A protein has these predicted regions:
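Catalytic-core regions built around general acid/base machinery
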Residues: 114-125
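Conserved small/polar residues in nucleotide/adenosyl-binding loops
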Residues: 231-240
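Substrate-recognition "cap/lid" segment bordering the active-site pocket of phosphatases
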Residues: 108, 129-181, 187-189, 211-213
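Glycine-rich phosphate-binding loop signature in dinucleotide/nucleotide-binding domains
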Residues: 3-4, 124, 173-176
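Acidic, Mg2+-coordinating phosphoryl-transfer loop and its flanking beta/alpha structural elements
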Residues: 183-219
Length: 241
């Protein structure tokens, strides 16, 4: 990256700061174990087709709900329980409890090696903001203190790669796109979205995947050690106190 002042760094979360796929699978298992324990009849009365229909109906009735993953999951479970004959208050209670089981596992993440060190450095030297389409809780994970702000899809009623995440970060950071850097694992949601807003970009590729997009990436980091070497941040020049 050219030697220049970077004042704003935005970070994706899932599969950028920590591996996510296994955690989501285990979270889903925990949720459905709880539901099956409380409502064992679900296995013979509810199938994937019914669950899909419930999801489609929820989004048709409230298109914005798809950006609030916490509420969306709770509403899906609630509708399933109502279909099984539960009373409204019972369905609400157990959907909240089921989601709690999901969320406990969802936030038990292990940061990639070197990630915490770079968070400390970026927090010291820049405006650091997280941009996520998901619903991880940085407070529970224990890294919220490193971020000036967190921006989720719920906050902007949009998913990356659309511009709202990136534009809101620029507004919060009070920075220009050319002073901004986004780091993320997804070629489309992260790199494509950030590039369309004229951010500098680092493709975080710890899985050593092949780049299949037409437009080449700007920089690639296969570890957080690589990412540090690419940022070239100038301490004491990057943020005015």
């Amino acid at each position: 990256m050219p030697r220049q002042i970077i004042k704003l760094v935005t970070l994706d979360l899932d599969d950028t700061l920590w591996p996510n796929k296994k955690g989501i699978i285990e979270s889903e298992k925990a949720l459905w174990r709880f539901v099956n324990l409380k409502f064992p009849e679900i296995e013979r009365k509810i199938n994937e087709e019914k669950i899909t229909a419930i999801k489609v109906n929820l989004v048709e009735n409230n298109p914005l709900i798809k950006f609030d993953l916490t509420r969306f999951r709770k509403e899906v479970i609630k509708e399933i329980l109502l279909h099984l004959g539960a009373q409204e208050n019972e369905a609400i209670y157990y959907s909240n409890e089921a989601f709690s089981e999901f969320f406990k596992i969802r936030n038990k993440v292990k940061l990639f090696p070197g990630a915490k060190n770079i968070l400390e450095r970026l927090n010291r030297d820049t405006n650091l903001i997280s941009l996520s389409n998901g619903n991880a809780d940085l407070g529970i994970i224990g890294i919220a203190k490193f971020f000036k702000a967190t921006i989720s899809s719920q906050d902007v009623s949009s998913n990356k790669p659309a511009p709202p995440h990136f534009l809101k970060a620029l507004k919060i950071g009070g920075c220009k796109p050319e002073e901004s850097l986004h780091i993320g694992d997804c070629p489309i949601n992260d790199i494509g979205g950030a590039r369309n807003c004229n951010f500098h970009t680092i493709w975080f590729n710890c899985e050593k995947r092949k780049w299949d997009e037409i437009v080449p990436y700007e920089y690639q980091a296969k570890s957080w050690k690589d990412a540090v070497s690419y940022t070239h941040l100038r301490a004491h020049e990057t943020r005015e106190d």
